[in-house]
Curated annotation (Swiss-Prot):
It is a multi-pass membrane protein. It is found in: Cell inner membrane. It catalyses: L-serine(in) + Na(+)(in) = L-serine(out) + Na(+)(out); L-threonine(in) + Na(+)(in) = L-threonine(out) + Na(+)(out). This is Serine/threonine transporter SstT. The chain crosses the membrane at residues 15-35, 43-63, 81-101, 140-160, 188-208, 217-237, 289-309, 315-335, 362-382. Involved in the import of serine and threonine into the cell, with the concomitant import of sodium (symport system). One of its GO terms (molecular function) is neutral L-amino acid:sodium symporter activity. Keywords: Amino-acid transport, Cell inner membrane, Cell membrane, Membrane, Symport, Transmembrane, Transmembrane helix, Transport.
């Protein structure tokens, strides 16, 4: 009986506070017993694995069900959300350019990133994304190819739009059932994050990051400017309301989880649950959240721009204003295609370095630096990317609701 009451109290507890407790205990365990801390990393891996496993099914079922059950003349607000995604990514690249010029970083380059193959150009990235669009639906689910999943989900939803009410009800019930499983997995987040924090501190530590403190400061500074200045400004522009309650809630409930899972895909169920909590339009967020995990890449744009300009300053190359603006555009476009590249934003750095005539050997050494600081860079990048998906979706939904009142 006491066991049941403990479980009930845990289930009713504040999830964010429970996650913070998990973080503290993870750091303590890594400090006291690194060997045991590495062992509990298994819990973190299981948590991330569970999120990654449920996310493709969740997206496919939700998208198909929401489109199939959409009423006539019912509008979704995808166009303004996509515009905000693209604007946010470009502004992120621009912020990184400004900070990189104000506080130029000089790197000590020694070795390259072995076994990594960067894309040859924008055309290759677009080609990869197009082929992901027409992927086999079963393979798309197995490989967690969200572009393919979205395409097939939308296609099936449109096909089912004229199906019988019973068939539509089955898909609606399926979406509710999958959502229940997601809520159960999210309740286990404190244990998962405890394992992730403990193993990260035990295996990596932060001594390796000390020599790259300046580079990290520029990277994280640009990300904070986007998260705390630019994103709130965009939300205020759309809603004409104080943006900070929404921004802080999204950073707290989406950003913290994304920071430790380091996976936009794994954070899709968390974002879906947050959108439901914010009472947003399900037909909109069921599409905008998985799409955002694919193309809304403000953090990736910052990483590409900052590390490319670090290489530029290290090589002593002069950069004029127009080239810097061109870099912002290239970084923004490349970042939107980061999901189409194995290794994500870091392997798009050679593409941006090509603008300045920097050799592939030097560019791959910069990529190696990116891998060294990845424990912080990748975590912060994912937290910014993922929380921004909800922020922009909420801003547009609330703006459209105000217009309709």
């Amino acid at each position: 009986m006491q066991h049941n009451s403990l479980v009930a109290r845990y289930a009713r507890g504040n999830l964010v506070l429970q996650i913070l407790v998990g973080i503290v205990f993870g750091i303590l365990l890594a400090t006291v017993s690194p060997s045991h801390a590495e062992s509990v990393g298994l819990i973190g891996s299981l948590f991330v694995g569970a999120l990654k496993a449920i996310a493709p099914i969740l997206v496919f079922i939700l998208v198909a069900a929401s489109i199939a059950n959409q009423k006539k003349n019912q509008h979704t607000y995808m166009r303004p959300i996509v515009v905000l995604y693209l604007m946010g990514t470009f502004f992120a690249a621009l912020a990184a350019v400004v900070l990189s010029f104000l506080f130029p970083t000089h790197l000590t380059l020694v070795t390259g990133a072995e076994g990594a193959t960067p894309p040859q150009g924008i055309a290759e990235i677009l080609r990869t994304l197009l082929f992901k669009l027409v992927d086999n639906p079963v393979n798309a689910l197995v490989e967690a190819n969200y572009i393919g999943i979205l395409a097939w989900g939308v296609g099936l939803g449109l096909a089912l739009h004229h199906a019988s009410a019973t068939t539509k009800a089955v898909f609606e019930d399926l979406s509710h059932s999958v959502s229940h499983i997601v809520r159960f997995i999210i309740r286990l987040a404190p244990f998962g994050i405890f394992g992730l924090v403990a193993s990260t501190f035990a295996t990596t530590g932060f001594s390796a990051l000390a020599s790259y403190a300046h580079l990290l400061a520029v990277l994280l500074g640009a990300m904070m400017i986007i998260a705390l200045v630019v994103n709130p400004a965009i939300v205020f522009f759309k809603t004409k309301q104080n943006p900070y309650p929404l921004v802080f809630q999204c950073l707290r409930e989406s950003g913290v989880t994304a920071f430790f899972t380091r996976s936009s895909a794994a954070n899709i169920p968390v974002n879906m649950a947050l959108c439901e909590k914010l009472d947003l339009d399900e037909d909109t967020y069921s599409v905008s959240i998985p799409l955002g995990a694919t193309i809304n890449m403000a953090g990736a744009a910052i990483t590409i721009t900052t590390l490319t300009l670090a290489a530029v300053h290290t090589m002593g190359i002069e950069v004029d204003l127009m080239t810097a603006l061109l870099l912002s555009v290239v970084a923004a476009v490349s970042a939107c295609g980061a999901s189409g590249v194995a290794g994500g934003s870091l392997l798009l750095i050679p593409l941006a370095c090509g603008l300045f005539g920097i050799s592939n050997d030097v560019a791959m050494q910069v990529v190696a630096v990116g891998f060294i600081i990845g424990v912080i860079q990748d975590s912060a990048e994912t937290a910014l990317n993922s929380s921004t998906d909800v922020i922009f979706t909420a801003a547009v939904c609330r703006s459209e609701q105000q217009k309709s009142q």
